[in-house]
Amino acid sequence: MFGYVTIYHKGLEKPELDRYQAYYCGLCRTLGKKYGLPGQLTLSYDLAFIAILHSALYEPETQFSAGRCAPHPVKARPRAANEFLDYAADMTIALAYYNFLDNWQDDHSRASLHQAQKLEPYLPAIRARWPRQTAAITAQLEALNALEKAGSHDLDALCRAFGDLLGAVFAFREDIWSPTLQAMGRGLGGFIYLMDAYDDLPKDARKGQFNALQELHDTLPPTEFEDRCHDLLTQQMGLCAQQFELLPILKETPEGKLLYNTIYSGVWSKYAPIRKHREGKQK
């Protein structure tokens, strides 16, 4: 379900792209140090975004360096290391573990079960470090699964379940900023859930699997359906952006530029080609 929260490359210059690479490679390196290759295979843009957000907000001591790795052995790449990349690595493993379990339950994918089993030994320590977040992840996934198994097309309830999950992950600690971070995560989580449904609609229809947007697709003409989906996605990102603007993050810092770029442009990077492809097929 993750992979939609990325940057819009054309809207950034080299210093910002290098800083993004530092956080992304830093997260990969942190996953490798803490969880080995199985951890690195769970790397996602979405959790790199959360690490950048927390770093911009809380301004921790961050070590920037450069180095080579197995996938990139020739040219040294920038790297970052701080406490929020450690946190993002833990949340990456927790979310990936439950996602693999969900895939196993839905599709009986042995590959997903195998991946979940590789990550399972790390879960007790992650739960001990982050009890509030991991409890919210399990509770909201249970709520979401119950809605989906019941065939619910209550988009508000479905988005709320995944939004509350991501909101808990956004709130690193309980402080003055946690309500704003939770609300921001709630909006972004709703967007991710709907974007995943929009992306997977043809595949889910072929397999006869639940899709939150199927009812809308079946009842609206194609053009109206596309416009309605765009409105729903815009609404969720509007909630996210509204809360983001309340945070004391300087727009002109490298991290600030990355966050503004992602929220206002990057998250739409996958939507646009999907819609263009579908509208082309309808002609």
Q: PLM features: residue spans?
A:
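Acidic catalytic motifs of isoprenoid enzymes
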Residues: 1-183, 190, 194-234, 238, ...
